[in-house]
């Protein structure tokens, strides 16, 4: 396979995984596609990609949802997140902190924002969803629409897991980033 075909194949896979149901995370885009300007809930799932925090901050600043939640305990990406966050933002405390706590501190430090809820017990994709649903029930947060924001490689998996447990809500995907590879120098 030549390099361009390989790049095209990688880009096809990346576009599939990094599902975004909206062209932009905006009230206008929500209104056009779903008929409402504000989702009931937006959830950022932890991971090692800091830009997810920026996506959530932008959504919070623009009133995209009624409630904002960060989900993430300690799992296989936690130490990488700690290392990257500490390297980029040493002011954000990371030692012995859960992913949700790290992202919450980042939101506070960089944007002066605080999510409504943190879920810090999750350790993997499956219990990210089940623990989120328990939190929503426990806190009596009703929702008919939910925006999921996750590392691009895990976005579709998070969507599929939620659909196993919650079939009556509008599930809106917005991967935290999208990438494309290019061939340079042949």
Features from the language model and the residues they span:
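A structural signal for short, hydrophobic/glycine-enriched beta-strand patches
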Residues: 1-186
């Amino acid at each position: 396979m030549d390099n361009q075909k390989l790049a095209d194949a990688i880009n096809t896979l990346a576009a599939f995984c990094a599902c975004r149901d909206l062209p932009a995370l905006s009230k206008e885009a929500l209104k056009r596609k779903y008929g409402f300007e504000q989702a009931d809930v937006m959830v950022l799932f932890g991971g090692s990609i800091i830009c997810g925090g920026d996506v959530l901050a932008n959504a919070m600043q623009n009133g995209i949802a009624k409630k904002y939640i960060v989900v993430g305990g300690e799992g296989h990406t936690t130490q990488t997140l700690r290392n990257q966050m500490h390297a980029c933002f040493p002011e954000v405390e990371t030692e012995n902190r859960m992913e949700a706590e790290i992202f919450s501190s980042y939101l506070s430090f960089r944007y002066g924002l605080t999510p409504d809820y943190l879920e810090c017990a999750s350790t993997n994709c499956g219990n990210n969803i089940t623990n989120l649903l328990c939190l929503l029930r426990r806190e009596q947060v009703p929702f008919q629409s939910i925006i999921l924001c996750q590392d691009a490689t895990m976005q579709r998996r998070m969507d599929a897991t939620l659909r196993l447990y919650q079939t009556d809500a509008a599930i809106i995907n917005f991967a935290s980033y999208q990438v494309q590879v290019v061939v340079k120098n042949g």
